[in-house]
C-alpha cells in the first residue's frame, strides 16, 4: 500500500505544480514550488510541502492564498487523478531548502578559514 501512496503523491506533486502555476489567479500566490507531497497510507490525507521565493511576509500571504484556494485545488486534483476519495490537502513550508543553504554557507566559511590558515 505504501507504494501506491508514493505513486499518488508523485502524481499529485506533478498536477499541483501545474494547478498552482496555471489555474490559481490569486496575486498572493506567486513563485511557489511544490517540493514534495506525502500521502497517508489510506490515501485520505496529503501534506504538500512548498517553497516560496520571498520574505516571511510573502510566505505567509502565499500560505493564506493557498488555504483559500484549497477547495478549488482539491476539486482539480479529483478531476485529474481518479481516486475513490480525493485526499484532504494541507500545505506546509519545506524548510529543508533553507537548512541546506545554511549548511552550504557554513561549509564555505569553514573552507575559507582553512585556506587562510595554510
Swiss-Prot record:
SUPFAM superfamilies assigned to the protein according to its UniProt record, in alphabetical order: Ribosome-binding factor A, RbfA
Family the UniProt entry places it in: Belongs to the RbfA family.
Subunit comment: Monomer. Binds 30S ribosomal subunits, but not 50S ribosomal subunits or 70S ribosomes.
InterPro entries: KH_dom-like_a/b (IPR015946), RbfA (IPR000238), RbfA_dom_sf (IPR023799), Ribosome-bd_factorA_CS (IPR020053)
Highest taxon listed in the record's lineage: Bacteria
Keyword Cytoplasm: yes
Species for this entry: Bacillus cereus (strain AH187)
Protein name: Ribosome-binding factor A
Gene Ontology MF: a single term: ribosomal small subunit binding
